[in-house]
Amino acid sequence: MVLWGFFLRFRFFLTCGRNCIQKTLDSQDDAKDPGLHTFSHTHMRKAFLLMNDLRSHSRKMLCDVLLVAGEVEIPAHRVVLASCSPYFCAMFTGDMSESKANHVEIRDVDGQTLLKLVDYIYSAEIEVSEENVQVLLPAASLLQLMDVRQVCCDFLQTQLHPTNCLGIRAFADLHACTVLLSQAHAYAAEQHFTDVMVGEEFMALSLQQVCSLISSDKLTVSTEEKVFEAMVAWIKHDKEARLEHMPKLMEHVRLPLLSRDYLVQIVEEEPLIKNNNTCKDFLIEAMKYHLLPADQRHLIKTDRTRPRTPISLPKVMMVVGGQAPKAIRSVECYDFQEDRWYQVADLPSRRCRAGVVYMAGKVYAVGGFNGSLRVRTVDVYDGLKDQWSSIPSMQERRSTLGAAVLGDLLYAVGGFDGSTGLSSVEAYNPKANEWMFVAPMNTRRSSVGVGVVDGKLYAVGGYDGASRQCLSTVEEFNPVSNKWCYVSDMSTRRSGAGVGVLSGQLYAAGGHDGPLVRKSVEVYDPTTNTWRQVCDMNMCRRNAGVCAINGLLYVIGGDDGSCNLSSVEYYDPAADKWSLIPTNMSNGRSYAGVSVIDKPL
């Protein structure tokens, strides 16, 4: 065979163990000539490119079939279609009428989608996007182009979000994409249920689908309260049609795992429970459970007394904005597992002295100071998209405020508006997408720390602009009565203290009283209404960020009265000891906001 003037002899070698058996295609060849074996990696690619060119609308050469879908006609070669698609192979090699037809109509696939898939058969290239994936996947399934189907599944897996995961789960179930179905279900139930339960997709679920979610032992919720709230919200979304399903849903709410106060104040007072005898029985079961001594509760064994065992997602610590030494936009995260800091998307504008919280899967940066003005704007970070967006602004400008999440509301507490300290408090309702005032505190407080324990919001210390004094007083807000009341004072005055909650107790770390910057730490126990001292921090800190994770309390950055700090230390209550983490932030930050978020997968 003559190719480009060269005589090529092909030999095939079959190796088995240590023996080599040689066969030759040329009977006249002898063992002295080793021959040449070659394989072209571009040969098939070139062949398919040429065939694709031959079928183009301008040429239509050697085509032997015309595929028709709606108004779209696609010339093609049977042998190419059959070699890549089992669907076409069965069509053209069997006894079907299409095997001899020049025109073949393809039903259940729109023309443009069919064109994309035929283009893929010839080119091995296809673009999957949000706009086409829902038509591309079922069409690829029909033509049995399994590589394309898998690419569509992989794409949808990367798009999973609390707002769409239930829809993707239903789509995967419809098209028998078992791996994607499992991934979407795990995402919704085992990773992000608290965020999913407030979305529109959850409210549109069927009874069977809701039961499937809330019955899972691996459901990821901070407390069983979230499951009860999700169930009540789903019923009330279409009360007339869904009220009859209340007992069925209550089977899967583990009421005995709720606190006694929550059972009495919330569950027992819920009208849906009061008016349903079967649901009352579940409440009585929970009350009996709590009446037993702790060492006897294991004697009651039902599905509702079994604790859930959620899969723990890796967490990262997010430090938002701050002063370094002026207001900055940068945001960095600390990976606890890898002991490293890394940058994520910057804030849209410079922001320090803001309130930062995590709510429903997003991080909120509330108010603050942009370097020239106190602001009332609010930016929201979506970790899955690594993007910031804006929501409606607060009604008042606030910097050095406290921010916390209680129930379904985000509270902005006190602060400084540029001329005076504030006692006012407002709350953001994400469902209504609006801010509203609630009862004001009894004292003006800027540089205030806040925390939530057992359904109550606490405002700790701060600075009273009227008396020009740092404060030791603490106030407690009851959202049911919409009232603030004083609780026990701290042992020392603290403005700019880092406030956090760990194991149901409120910590106040550092802060200052006039020029004196503190490293002392005290802890408030709401059950006894008392404060106690714990071990001092390693460094004096004020205006530091605080967060709690894995039974440890972290204090991040701040300043010592002369310079900003880049170090982070954590408190272990079991050892009553503070320790520094090995790696500092990229630069010193005071007045930064801190939150713990799920590590983006």
Swiss-Prot record:
It is found in: Cytoplasm, Cytoskeleton; Cytoplasm, Cytosol. One of its GO terms (biological process) is protein K48-linked ubiquitination. SUPFAM superfamilies: Galactose oxidase, central domain, POZ domain. The keyword Flavoprotein does not apply. Keywords: Actin-binding, Cytoplasm, Cytoskeleton, Kelch repeat, Repeat, Ubl conjugation pathway. Substrate-specific adapter of a BCR (BTB-CUL3-RBX1) E3 ubiquitin ligase complex that acts as a regulator of ion transport in the distal nephron. The BCR(KLHL3) complex acts by mediating ubiquitination and degradation of WNK1 and WNK4, two activators of Na-Cl cotransporter SLC12A3/NCC in distal convoluted tubule cells of kidney, thereby regulating NaCl reabsorption. This is Kelch-like protein 3. It comes from Danio rerio (Zebrafish). The lineage of its organism: Eukaryota, Metazoa, Chordata, Craniata, Vertebrata.
